[in-house]
């Protein structure tokens, strides 16, 4: 956590502009659809921000990803907004990434859908929460791939929890130190409240207009699931316990905390961990397992590490840096090539979402296992 302050000082001192994106991160999902992306700031006036000393209402940043079957005009969108990209260049420069790496990246997006069809299609919604001290933008490519399989995805940045959140008016909120049990509990509770707030925005015409321009809405938008990585996975479990509108949840590599461990819930839930992260090694997974009384599965991904479930492996592969970075990067990202890891995560998450939100068959997991032999079904 101490890296945040020094990174911010470097960022403020340099403040470089975003260069033209030269490397496009690919959509590797098997069911390819063009995806539109938009971001908006949303404010929950019903609660105060627990991290702000002046009692201001809680404001968050959210990105919306939604597929279109008919795209009239495409655009290479910068992978991250300018200040965030500069911040990440400095942060991950410590791992050997060349300066300007994140500023050089782009996403192939749909800028203008066809007048008929396109983004007006009625689709289920996936809510996403990332890791502690991690920008939502470090999951943009993965979430674009999930959206391409036929879902609206709403990705949430949790200010003061994420290492940096950049708002449209130029405001930058940096993270606070979150280390003690009490601090983690506050962060978790705040995340669950953020997720609940965003889940209600599909009934808010103003929010939909900002996050999903051109989207007409429909009953399927009220079919929702939640996916989270790391602390976001813990938040996904907490949200499943408290938000009745959620039909299922996925925890990617996150240890869990709080009353959900003993209370549990009866809706579908999937655990996917990196190599050696299972019920046998994570007490929270072992504790919650018997209290998950609905459909459940646990998977272990061999040769993966904690941040394998982010865009970082794909970024490194797309930049041609596989095998060229310090050995300690493997402790962070594992050894699975980036396109394959993104495809693996997308395939398993989409199989779960199809099952709980679209009535898909459970045998999709067996088919995925045949393709991705790194994945072991633990339970």
Located regions from the model:
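Fungal secretory targeting signals
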Residues: 1-21
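Active-site machinery of serine-nucleophile hydrolases
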Residues: 68-69, 78-98, 137-177, 302
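Short substrate-entry loop that stabilizes the transition state in hydrolases
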Residues: 105-166, 277-279
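The feature captures the conserved acid-bearing segment of alpha/beta-hydrolase catalytic domains
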Residues: 120, 247-309
């Amino acid at each position: 956590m101490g890296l945040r302050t020094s990174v911010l000082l470097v960022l403020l001192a340099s403040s470089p502009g975003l260069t033209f994106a030269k490397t496009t991160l690919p959509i590797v999902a098997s069911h390819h659809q063009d995806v539109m992306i938009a971001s908006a700031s949303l404010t929950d006036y019903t609660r105060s921000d627990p991290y702000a000393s002046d009692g201001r209402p809680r404001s968050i940043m959210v990105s919306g990803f939604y597929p279109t079957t008919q795209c009239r005009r495409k655009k290479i969108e910068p992978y991250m907004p300018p200040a965030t990209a500069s911040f990440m260049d400095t942060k991950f420069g410590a791992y050997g990434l060349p300066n300007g790496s994140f500023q050089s990246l782009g996403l192939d997006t749909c800028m203008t859908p066809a007048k008929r069809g396109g983004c007006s299609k009625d689709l289920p919604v996936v809510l996403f929460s990332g890791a502690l001290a991690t920008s939502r933008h470090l999951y943009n490519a993965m979430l674009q791939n999930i959206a391409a399989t036929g879902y609206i995805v709403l990705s949430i940045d949790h200010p003061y929890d994420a290492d940096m959140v950049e708002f449209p008016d130029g405001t930058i909120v940096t993270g606070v130190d979150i280390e003690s049990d009490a601090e983690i509990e506050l962060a978790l509770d705040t995340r669950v409240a953020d997720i609940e707030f965003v889940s209600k925005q599909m009934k808010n015409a103003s929010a939909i207009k900002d996050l999903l321009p051109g989207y007409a809405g429909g009953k399927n938008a009220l079919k929702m699931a939640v996916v989270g990585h790391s602390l976001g996975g813990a938040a996904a479990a907490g949200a499943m316990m408290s938000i009745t509108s959620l039909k299922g949840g996925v925890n990617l590599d996150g240890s869990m905390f709080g009353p959900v461990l003993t209370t549990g819930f009866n809706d579908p839930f999937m655990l996917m961990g990196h190599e050696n992260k299972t019920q046998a090694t994570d007490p929270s997974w072992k504790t919650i397992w018997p209290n998950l009384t609905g459909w459940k599965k646990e998977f272990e991904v061999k040769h993966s590490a904690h941040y394998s479930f982010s865009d970082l492996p794909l970024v490194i592969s797309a930049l041609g840096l596989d095998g060229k970075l310090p050995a300690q990067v493997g402790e962070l990202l594992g050894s699975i090539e980036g396109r394959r890891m993104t495809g693996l995560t997308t395939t398993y998450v989409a199989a779960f979402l199809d099952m709980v939100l679209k009535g898909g068959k459970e045998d999709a997991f067996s088919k995925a296992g045949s393709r991705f032999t790194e994945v072991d079904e633990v339970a």
